[in-house]
Amino acid sequence: MHCSPELMDLTRKLEILADAAKYDASCASSGAARKDSRDGKGIGSTGGMGICHSYTPDGRCVSLLKVLLTNACLYDCHYCINRRSSNVQRARFTPEEVAQLTLDFYKRNYIEGLFLSSGIVRSADHTMEQVIEVARQLREVHHFRGYIHLKTIPEASQALIDKAGRYADRISINIELPSQQSLDRLAPEKNLTNTKQAMHGIRQRIDESLAAKKEARQIVNRPRVKAPTFATGQSTQMIVGADDSTDALVLHRADELYREVRLRRVYYSGFSPIPEPSVLLPIKPPPLVREHRLYQADWLLRFYGFDVGELLPKEDPNLDLDLDPKLAWALRNRSVFPVDINRAPQEMLWRIPGLGTVNVARILAARRWSRLTLADLQRMRVNLKKVQPFIVAADHRPRIALLESPQLRQHFLPGPRQLELNFNALPAATAADAAMALSGQI
């Protein structure tokens, strides 16, 4: 029998609420475990419960305490481990407890800030008030100047969301799924229109804050601002693989949000099967590579000048899992290649598979002084195997037959993986058994 959330030991609360927060991708982890930190123990370890890594608006990587205020929730979203009907142990922090935990972790140099989200209790406004109270105490009572990322609730009043933005460095609202049809099926309490309206309100406050700061810079003897006037950006998360939405629909929604509300980032989170799942959910998670391809396509939309329709034509609404999106586009549009790297404009160089924005900048700078060769590209650490079929250099021109060959796609496909025998998984096996298996005797 579970004990009351209010009477629970603080350490146990942290275990439960840090674990419950891991499903939110809006606070991105580096994705890699540091050497000797995998067990979360030892001096200097940042792999303990509730600690994740994210990036600040100025590009710094910071360690954050990532927790929920509570995992109790009024909503019954089918894909969520913390849904109302889920049989999980519930816990709840008070605002004072979260503020003190943040300070304790910060003083011990475990973290540089806080990522705080919450299940919905009583009402959206009540929950939002509790989340804001944590940030208020940190900023006004304890004079905390570390990084704060607050997960806001679209159903909360705009006044409360505005108040959250005055305390936080970044705020985010999860859109969850790309269409209202999917929300009606899997998260009936959520409304896409409400979410977008809240995002537009945040964008307006960010614009007003930037304008005020610009005006303040023109005043010589202005008082120093010790905390952000308003959050410097917002982000969101979409769950991938919980419904039948195509990659085209997901990316069209992301592209719309980038353009309309100027999101800093859309996070794509592959659906993870949960205990006691709804019959409306898939049995298996989507391939992990699908999430990776969506991030690659997202990058092309934001920084390389691609449109969703170019990456995903109507006849093929899902990304190729075997090839990265830029390479897949190039193979569908071979008529625009080869591209002369010594003459092509920047926008065309960005579209060459294997060339990123950094290498394109180097090429543009270097070709002012001499015609570039493959050796020059190699010195720039360009992947020659990937770019050669698509470029013309001073000493290289690809064979048209190769560029037009149906076999070119095969050239870029990953090779077959060697299966490994894991003898550690067979405790009964002896060294002699292993030797016989390797020699083909069994």
What are these regions (language model features)?
Residues 64, 77, 116, 173, ...:
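Conserved, mostly hydrophobic/aromatic
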Residues 65-68, 96-107:
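Short, charged beta->alpha transition segments
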Residues 339-366, 370-389:
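Helix-hairpin-helix
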Residues 1-72, 383-384, 389-392, 396-442:
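Flexible, acidic/Gly-rich N-terminal and inter-domain linker regions that tether
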Residues 279-350, 386-433, 437, 441-442:
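Long, highly charged, low-complexity intrinsically disordered interaction regions
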Residues 99, 122-311:
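Conserved AdoMet/S-adenosylmethionine-binding subsite of the radical SAM
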Residues 101-117, 297:
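Short Fe-S-cluster ligation motifs
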Residues 67-96:
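Canonical Radical SAM [4Fe-4S] cluster-binding loop centered on the CxxxCxxC motif
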